């Protein structure tokens, strides 16, 4: 893989999760452009820089030890990539503090480097949080590959930060620079709320949760077919989102024990708040993680999963395949994985390579619900 070479450093970077013979690199031209732009401004060593949505740590690791850097984002895999890439390049483990998107950072910051996220609601929430956290004369510099840079990103920066200047294109990347100006303090419109009729639930979604404004159609197809009569089963909701699968299952299985895990900090935050609203103080475990990678082998009886088919702008089934493998490792012999997926993704044949038996529980014209037994 090529090295990331910038005026700040030459780094050997890897993506997360790691894949054998991964054809994708851990940085792109937008990362290079952001670092070059910052270097051209010649900030001194005391310059406090906030890095937002740094996919695999390319920005923060490049600046580690040279400026006062804080990184923040919603991806646990992004956090893990930053830690691994710091170590991989001989940089101190703690040289870049990381603040999950479910928490708030503390300014003031002189510069903010932003990778424009796929979900503009996350960008809006971050820009609102920046109000009152920027030093006089501060700049917010957002970067993206042009094909992933919507006009609305600049509009949001103008609305919440100040006047925006777009750069020339360079290697198919573009920067948007907002100089801090007086703006009215905004009230965040997040989390979003919606009501589910069956089961009767009022649910909230923080800004970066998938299908933020309502129940996604895959989950809607899955809900009527969740397993019942689980007794004291140990159940995990893998890629839990706002927790609706686990909550619906828990309402039907009052003795079961639940673990809710997602790689999105805002998803886990949403799930925890929704669980509390629906089930009160009933115990459950919540954490942001690389799926079930940290769980003991054969520690679960049931796994529920509505697997994602993209990582940021990269589409594919590699994340789903990884989740299926993790579920197999975590399940006891005789345990079961229940999933929902688009028909065209061919999950039945993939599961058959890992599990003793795979059966179709239900189907709609678009989705299939499968049960795979270990």
UniProtKB/Swiss-Prot annotation:
EC category name: transferase
Annotated EC: 2.1.1.174
Reaction equations catalysed: guanosine(1835) in 23S rRNA + S-adenosyl-L-methionine = N(2)-methylguanosine(1835) in 23S rRNA + S-adenosyl-L-homocysteine + H(+)
Subcellular location: Cytoplasm
One cellular component (GO) term of this entry: cytoplasm
Keyword S-adenosyl-L-methionine: yes
Family matches, as SUPFAM superfamilies: S-adenosyl-L-methionine-dependent methyltransferases
GO molecular function, one term: nucleic acid binding
Disulfide cysteine pairs (residue numbers): none
Keyword terms of this UniProt record: Cytoplasm, Methyltransferase, rRNA processing, S-adenosyl-L-methionine, Transferase
Chief subcellular location: cytoplasm
Family assignment from sequence similarity: Belongs to the methyltransferase superfamily. RlmG family.
Protein function: Specifically methylates the guanine in position 1835 (m2G1835) of 23S rRNA.
Name the UniProt record assigns to this protein: Ribosomal RNA large subunit methyltransferase G
Species annotation: Pseudomonas putida (strain ATCC 700007 / DSM 6899 / JCM 31910 / BCRC 17059 / LMG 24140 / F1)
Gene that encodes it: rlmG
């Amino acid at each position: 893989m090529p090295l990331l070479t910038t005026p700040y450093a030459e780094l050997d970077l890897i993506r997360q999760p790691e894949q054998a013979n991964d054809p994708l690199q851990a940085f792109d031209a937008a990362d290079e452009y952001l670092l070059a732009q910052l270097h051209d401004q010649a900030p001194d060593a005391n310059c406090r820089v906030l890095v937002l949505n740094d996919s695999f740590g390319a920005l923060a690791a490049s600046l580690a030890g040279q400026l006062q850097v804080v990184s923040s984002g919603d991806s646990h895999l992004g956090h893990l990539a930053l830690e691994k890439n710091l170590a991989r390049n001989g940089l101190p483990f703690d040289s870049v503090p990381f603040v999950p998107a479910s928490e708030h950072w503390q300014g003031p910051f002189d510069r903010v480097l932003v990778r424009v996220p796929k979900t503009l609601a996350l960008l809006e929430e971050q820009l609102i949080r920046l109000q009152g956290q920027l030093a006089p004369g501060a700049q917010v510099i957002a970067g993206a590959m042009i094909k992933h840079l919507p006009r609305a990103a600049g509009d949001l920066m103008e609305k919440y930060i100040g006047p925006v200047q777009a750069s020339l294109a360079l290697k198919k990347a573009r920067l948007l620079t907002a100089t801090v100006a007086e703006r009215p303090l905004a009230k965040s419109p997040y989390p979003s709320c919606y009501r589910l009729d069956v089961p009767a639930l009022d649910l909230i979604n923080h800004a970066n949760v998938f299908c933020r404004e309502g129940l996604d159609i895959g989950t809607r197809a899955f809900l009527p077919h969740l397993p019942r009569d689980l007794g004291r089963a140990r159940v995990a909701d893998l890629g839990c989102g706002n927790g609706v699968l686990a909550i619906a299952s828990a309402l039907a299985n009052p003795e079961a024990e639940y673990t809710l895990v997602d790689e999105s900090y805002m998803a886990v935050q949403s799930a925890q708040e929704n669980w509390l609203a629906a089930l009160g103080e009933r115990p459950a475990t919540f954490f942001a993680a690389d799926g079930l990678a940290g769980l003991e082998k054969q520690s679960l009886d049931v796994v529920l999963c509505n697997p994602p088919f993209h990582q940021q702008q990269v589409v594919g089934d590699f994340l789903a395949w990884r989740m299926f493998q993790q579920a197999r490792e975590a399940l006891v012999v005789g345990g079961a994985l229940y999933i929902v997926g688009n028909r065209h993704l061919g999950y039945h044949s993939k599961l058959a390579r890992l599990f003793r038996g795979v059966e179709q529980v239900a189907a709609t014209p678009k989705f299939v619900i499968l049960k795979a037994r270990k």
